[in-house]
Every structure is written in C-alpha cells, then in structure tokens.
Amino acid sequence: MSLRFVIGRAGSGKSTLCLHEVQEELKQRPRGETILYLVPEQMTFQTQQALIGSEDVRGSIRAQVFSFSRLAWKVLQEVGGASRLHIDEAGVHMLLRKIVESRKDGLSVFQKAAEQNGFFEHLGSMIAEFKRYNVTPSNVYEMWQQLDAHSSSAEQKLLANKVYDLQLLYDDFERALIGKYLDSEDYLQLLVEKLPQSEYVKGAEIYIDGFHSFSPQELEIVRQLMICGARVTITLTIDEKTLAQPVNELDLFYETTLTYEKIKQVAREEKIEIEKTIPLMEQPRFHSPALAHLEAHYEARPNEKFNGEASVTIHTAANLRAEVEGVAREIRRLVADENYRYRDIAVLLRNGESYYDVMRTLFTDYNIPHFIDEKRPMSHHPLVECIRSALEIISGNWRYDAVFRCVKTELLYPLDVRKETMREEMDEFENYCLAYGVQGKRWTSEDPWMYRRYRSLDDTDGMITDSEREMEEKINRLRGVVRTPVIRMQKRLKRAGTVMQMCEAVYLFLEELDVPKKLEALRIRAEESGDFLFATDHEQVWEEVMSLLDTFVEMLGEEKMSLSMFTDVMSTGLEALQFANIPPSLDQVLIANIDRSRLSNVKATFVIGVNEGVIPAAPMDEGMLSDEERDVLSAAGIELAPTTRQTLLEEQFVMYQMVTRATEKLYISCPLADEEGKTLLASSFIKKIKRMFPDVKDTFITNDVNDLSRSEQISYVATPEVTLSYVMQQLQTWKRYGFEGNLDFWWDVYNFYVTSDEWKQKSSRVLSSLFYRNRAQKLSTAVSRDLYGDKIKGSVSRMELFNRCAYAHFAQHGLSLRERDIFKLDAPDIGELFHAALKRIADRLLRENRTWADLSIKECEHLSAVVIEEIAPLLQRQILLSSNRHFYLKQKLQQIIFRTSIILREHAKSSGFVPVDLEVPFGMGGTGSLPPMEFSLPNGVKMEVVGRIDRVDKAEDENGTFLRIIDYKSSSKALDLTEVYYGLALQMLTYLDVVTSNAHTWMKKGGTASPAGVLYFHIHNPIVEVKGDASEAEIEKEILKKFKMKGLVLGDADVVRLMDNKLSTGSSDIISAGLKKDGSFSARSSIASEQEFNVLQKYVHHTFENIGKDITEGVIDIAPYKKGNKAACTFCNFKSVCQFDESLEDNQFRTLKDMKDSEAMEKIREEVGGE
C-alpha cells in the first residue's frame, strides 16, 4: 500500500504520464491485477478513448475508467448492497415535496418558501451537500440546539429556525430512504463501507486524475482506496515551488495545495507509505510559445509581457449574436485552411442560458457539428406539458389556460386525424371558449354546449340558423376530444385510494391517448428531417416519465394523498426531468461550461462571453444558506461547501485552467450588448491578457459588413444559409444609398443564388423582399364589386373609418376581418348597455305619457335597477351574471344609470326641448325607420348611409319648430370642426340632416323644422370636489356641471334659452354656450348659424360622395391619419395585417393640421361653395 503524487502546472503532462504507464502495463501484463483509473464524471468518455487510443492497446478488461459513482455501482454489484431502489433527482424532489407538504404546519421558515420556484431543487442540493460533507441529521439537530440556546439577534433566530426546519426535513428524508432507497450520495457512502470487502479493488493499481479537490465523503473513498489498493497515484495541478512555501489563500494553487496536504494527512493516519512526489517541469502540451508564456507567467505580478506574434486572439463583438457568428466563421476557417478537425476545437463559456439556443441555431446554419455538454430540461416537451396541464385542469377546476396548454401539446388529438385540420378546428374551438368564458362546471356538465352568434340586445327572436347548428355540432365534437380523456382520468383519480392507483390513472390516460404511438410518429418525423437530437428526445421522455411513475409508486405507492398534493408532487418530479446527453461523435466541436469542463487534446479554445460579472464571476448568494450563515456553522464545527468568498478565491484557478486547455490557439471574446440590446462591459480579465500580450489587437466583430474591407467581407461568405442574409444586407444598402463599395463581389454571390438549381427558389422568396414595398394596390372594379356589391349600404362610422385609414376599412368591410371575441366587458358593451337602459326607461315614460321631468329621485333609482336587471341576462352571453366581480360591476353600472336619470330629470325641468323619439333607425327597413341618406355615385353605384340615432328632441316657439340630436357617450366628447373637415366626425351632422329632412315624422301638421344643434351627453357617475361645509344642493349643482353637454348649437339666443330656461346671462350649466349681458354669445360658446348648419350638411353630403367613389374604385391605401397626438393606428385592430412601418418609404402618416373652428368652417365653405 503506497501513495504517489504526480504534480505539475497545467500542460506539464500529468495525465499523459499516467495513461502511458497504464498502457505500458497493459502491453507488458494484459492479465495482471486490476487497474482503476478514476476521473470526474465529465472526463470518463474522453479518458476511455485516450486509454484505448494507442496502437498497442485496442481494448482491455484489466484497466477500467470510472467516476466515483460508477465505481460505487461496480463494487455494490460485486459485494451486494445495490438491492435498494435508486431514486434519481426527480424522485428526490418528489419525496421532498411530499415531506414538506406533510410537515408544513410545523415549519418555521420554509412554510411559505416552499411555494417559490426552485425551492425543492435548493432543498435537494442542501441535503446532498450535507451528505457529501458527512453531516448527519443528528449533527444538524445538535447544531440547532446550540444555535437556539444562544440566539439573541433576529439574524441568529432566523438561522436557528432555518436549521431547525432543515433538520426536520433531512431527518424525515433519511427515514423515508432507510432500507428501501438510495440516492446518488448514498451510493458514495455505501462505497466507503463496502470497499474493504471488494476483491475487485483489493491489490489494484489506482490512478486518480483530473480532480482539484475532494469533499469529505470523497476523501473517505480515497482513504479506503489507499487501504485496499496496491498503490494510489494522484495527479494534482500544483507548481512544485508552491509546496516549499507556507500555504497562502491568495496563491493560484491554494485549493490543490490544500487537497495535497489533506490526502497526505489521511495517508499518515492510515500509515500508508508516501512515495516520492513526481514533479513535472516541462510544458509538452503547448505548441505555441505564446500559450506556454501565458501558462508559465499567469499569476506573475506585474504581468510578464510577451513580445512578438502571439497565438492569442481577442475579439469584442457588437452583440452576442455577432460574437457567436464570429466564432463560427473562425472555426470554419481553421477547418478549411489549417486542416483542423472539429474535435480539435472547444468553446468554453459560463452563462450558457444566454448562449446555447443561439449557438445551436448558428452552428447548425454554419454546418458545424457540435456537442453541447449540458443537460436540457424536459419541462417543455409535449408529453411532460400534457401530464402537468391535464392534472392542473382537474385540480384547478378546468381553467382556460390549463385546458388549452394541454390541447396545444396535440397529444389529445385522435391518432389518425390530420393534424393541420385539427389545429384549425381547435383554434376555432378556443375562440368559442374565449368568447363564452367556458371553464369550470361547463366542462364537466353533460349538457351540450350552445352556439349563437351574438347580434345585439334587441335580437331576441331565438331562432338558430343552419350555420349556427353546424358550428354547434363541431364545438360539441371537439369538446368531446378534449373532455373525454381528461374526465376519464379525473374519475379514476377521485376513485383512487392510493398513490399507486393515482399513478395508474395517469398511465391509463397516456395509453388511451396512444401517446407511445404518437411519440414514435414524432421521432420518425424528426429523423426524416435530419434532427436526430429531437428524435432521441421523444424516446427518452417516455422512458423517463415511466421511470418517474415507477419511482412514485415505489416510494409512496400505498399511501393516501389528496389530488392537490398528488398534482404538486407529480409536477415537482416532472420539473426535475432532464434529457441525457448523447455521447459526442468522433468529430464535433465541444461546447462546455468553464466550471465543469475537463478538456484535453484540443488545439484551439474559444472562451466566449468574457464579460464583467461573468468571468470572473460576481459574488452571488444562492441556496438555502448565506455566506454569513455558513461561516457561523463552520465556526461551530460543521464543514460545508465553500462560501462565496472562498469560491471567488478559487476563481483565478478556474480561469487559469480555462486558458491553458489549448495546445495551439486561444481566442477570447466578449459582446458589448446582449440579445435584448442591453449594454455589457468587457471583463477585467481581458485587460490582464492585453497587458501580457501588448502586440495583440482587439478586433471588433459586427453583423454589418459595410464598414469592412473586401478581404474581411469574404470571410462572411460561409454556407448558403448564412450568406444569404449578408447578400440581402449589402443589396439593401445599395438600394437605399446607392453605395457601390465592394458590391461587385456581392453581385457574384447574388448570381450564385439566382442561377443555382438548389437555391434559386429558396433565395427568390428572401431576395424578393429587397424590392418589397408595403403598398396596397388599388382593387380592380370587378374585385371591388365582388367585395362590396353593386349597392353599398354602410353606417356613418364606416365612412369615418375609411377617412381614418382606407386599408382599415378594406380589412373590416372588404375582408370582414375581426378580432377574436373574448368573454369580457369592453367599452362598446358598456356603451350598448347604457343606450339600452336609457331607451327602456324613456320608452316606458312615452307609454305612460310622462317625461323625465315627472320622475322622482326614488323612481329614478327604481327604474335604473329594473332596466339593468332586464338587460343583464342579454348582454355579452350573461357576463354580468358570471361572477361576483361582474355582479359588483353590474351594481356600479346601475348607479351610473341612476345618476344619469337624475341629470336627465334636471335637464328636462330646465328645457323646452323634449325627447320625441329614441334609437331612431334610418335606412334600416321595417316599421318606424326613416329613409336612408342616398347617393348615386359617378360610376353608377348606389350608396346608402344608414344608422340609428340615440335621441331626437323637439321644441316649438313662435319662430317655428326646432330639432336637436342627443348622442349618449360613455366618455367625454366634443364636436371638433377640424375633424368634420377631414371626414373623421360626420355622425352627429348626418343625424341632424336626416331628422330635419324628415321633420314631418314628429310634426302633427307636417311642415319643416330648423336644426337646433347636436350635443353629446356623457354617461358617467362623476366625483366632484367641494368645500367641507357645502350643502347637498351645492354638491348637486357641481355634479350637474359635470354633465354639461358639448357639441354645436344654433346661434339663436331664444333657442339656447329653450335648451336652458334658467339661462339669462353667463354660462349655461346644461350646454356649452353662454350669453353676455347684451344678449350676444360668449366667446367660448359652441354655436353655428342656420346657414352654417346648412353648409355643414352640404359638406357631409359632399364627403360621403367622395368616400363612396373611392371605396367603389378600390382605394385601399395604407395611409392612416395623424393629428396631434391622435392617430388611426392607436386603437386599430388591423396593425398586424397592414404591417404599417414608418421606416419604409411608402408608409407615412397623413398628417392632418389642427385648426381653429373658424378656420375649419372657412375651408368647409370653400369645398362646397357656401357663402
């Protein structure tokens, strides 16, 4: 029994010496004693290859490469002890979840923390750490007693409570495992116990290579190996000079020196012979003088400079994507020009979550075979999501999001269905569920679902159309596709008495959905498309899910568990599932994490993402215990993993390892911005490298090739997939600026695409965008007639929409596009309710031959409640009756109608105008409808403007009859003559024209009527500010002012007084007008003469004719208006359709100039030739 150390700096040949010794031994004595070669887990594959890579050694039974965990399996299979069931990380998390849930009421700190994402991952890591450092539950309990007895400050009490919780959970976890299960850490403890019984290890020649430190648990394994083996050889990266000096924590080799001393101490304790240490002084790894200099002088202060050409390259990239593309281009150059193999190259990084997706995409585009040494979570796989969401459906009462997350996995679809068709149908089905607010009992009820197209509050005929019946049948068929398998599992879960039966319900759910066959189909499809990584994913995920169910049953099978806990435990297990890495092929670029990688035999290393806070790493407190808490435990005798401070001290060694992997070339790079454009800073480590290699230039990498020389641009020509984007970039620059530059070279590349049989069609789709103009071509007469018909019948709102944006009109009225209907109460729904409520009250008053003025306050309250109760079941599929929140909203809406009724009562008392009709249709056909506003367009098309007028008021005096329009609005609005001029506000003047043209309808003896004005009535329940001693009358007066109607009224003092008979001088509280003492109107009055009203009405006719002409002639320009801070696009539903983009030459707003009313009126006169 002896111990031998082989030490040396990085690249000195320690591993090579050991491998050569093993290979020589195998040649000399192929059937001798066992040779064990122990390495970290991530080194096993490459070490096995290196061991049998010699021409003289093609295989061996005598020598085996192991990690500690694999050695544990080997020994336990030999001597026994492996009969207990192994539980993996997912099983550990599930067991911990169950323990925490059952212990929740007794936990002090973790009761609420258990609900946070990542809690069980941290808890599992903490328990694993306890085990690695030989800390037992009783040790933790003793620590709690000690802390609890001496806790005085809040921080000390918090730590004591935290340790108490950890002790409870750790003890429960260990009790659950005893005699039944083994987790990964238990195998190592068993290995310690069983090694003395192993004949396989007894007398073996043992090599331990690639480690820098050992946990106490691993150190115990090393102890037993030294006792059992013939000789143990351990390699450590240490400079021999370091061993001759006192240990200093700032020394580069501090960590490995401590390891060296610990192992020697163990050897002394066990009286193991310590052979003479073998120091290696040469640097055989480095073929480059610059890299040899970097290794030899890495820790030197001040930095030793290397003068001359260096094989070290530094790049700064514009952004992360540019950095990765730069790496890809250089890898292709090394392979093409310098005869590198892909396996000779490695990419090292730390923040993989920012890089991996980009690297997968770009390396694939550049045709670079690669292997990412990182396990991927299974959480996003359709199978995992299907199980998780299906359980959420059941435990969460069939919420919309859970249901359609499950649907979108496509595993609920019948096996033989055409997926494209089913996707379209499910999209329609989802729209139905959103529109009808389907969730909860609606899913579980046996009653069939109904489908009715929502029309209006007045549509109560109840007749179902053929298309509605057909849609109803489809909806119920699709409901069955979703509902049937989940309901079946729900019933089984509710009947289940044990966890085993619950797991069986999940398994049967998957089997009855034919999930294995569906996954096999996905695997075949992935293989056919050449995506072999995803093909293996579909195989792995089924095996892992089945293993998870087996583990669940093995651990907790006979226990009873609530559905919610079962769902939580299962979700925790599913979250922990990971795809196993497929071993790399013989020729791939290795992409690995700096902290975990153990590379060898690479010629070139790319270290990317070297940004401040990443390399070196910024201090971060992660996990269950903070650094301060770890220090307290350490002082009390419990050794745990290094603190952040210790980790930062080790960071220099990590970076040293990172830059000494390559034999020929080192590339270091950092991006100046991340994928979202956020600024990043270069690491101070780059400055250190620059000081060591002052002749190395920092090269800037960009995605924009325009600023590069011709020779530099040539390097951007890689694969056809990648190069196409750069061709586009160059030609776009040429098109926009006419810049020639290196365009002759890019034209050659362009010619390749347009002449290549393989790329002609693919590239044409991309290159066509070069000449893309986001312009909507005018519709032909034939198409226009097909879309709109030979007779146009449209509302005033439709005409206004055309003037806001012709393309939006085309999308809505030509293509009939609309947003999906969602079960929610929007402003239009509330507006419709207000209109209907006031109409019902007014209709009742007309039937009773009463006016608003006749109502009492109590009647206003009663009537508002009655009409809201009548309307609520008719509005938006009974949305106001669907929940407590909406019921509360119904009460608030009733209060608004009540307040509005009081104001209308006050208005009626003060006005000579009385309502004579409500919701007056024109051009709608049927009894009571006024005729439409008709136009014969120059191209022969007939156009009718139709609509419905909220309220018509009439007043009479000795000067004649006057009619005015009142329009109810749920928001404040005024009549802007500028918007009238631009055709954006035509509604009120159109209504006034219609009623005055048909005045005989409301006049007993026939005759004509004059326009009195148009006014907006704002329906709301305002809050007013008054003095503390204000009377109720004063408060009511202030509220009345908030209801002042805005609009445009006839500039006749007598007519204005008819609208407000309390007005003598000053401003009216009812309308936006006021009188001076001399009887003239105040400056702020919104008035127009009768002649001006006539001009406005003529202008409205003129505008409609122009709109009709443009519609029928196919005008669909993408030309939205913009006036001040208002724009047509602000609330437009069709932005994703027109793709309006101001950066495009053809896409510009029609900027409308704001004008005073007098200016606008003058322009209107000019248009119609009015006086």
Swiss-Prot record:
Cofactor: Mg(2+); [4Fe-4S] cluster
Key word Transmembrane helix present: no
Molecular functions (GO terms): 4 iron, 4 sulfur cluster binding; 5'-3' exonuclease activity; ATP binding; double-stranded DNA binding; helicase activity; metal ion binding
Record-level GO BP terms: double-strand break repair via homologous recombination
Cofactor annotation comment: Binds 1 [4Fe-4S] cluster.
HAMAP family, sorted: AddB_type1
Note: Despite having conserved helicase domains, this subunit does not have helicase activity.
Function: The heterodimer acts as both an ATP-dependent DNA helicase and an ATP-dependent, dual-direction single-stranded exonuclease. Recognizes the chi site generating a DNA molecule suitable for the initiation of homologous recombination. The AddB subunit has 5' -> 3' nuclease activity but not helicase activity.
Name by which UniProt lists this protein: ATP-dependent helicase/deoxyribonuclease subunit B
Organism of origin: Bacillus cereus (strain AH187)
Gene that this polypeptide is encoded by: addB
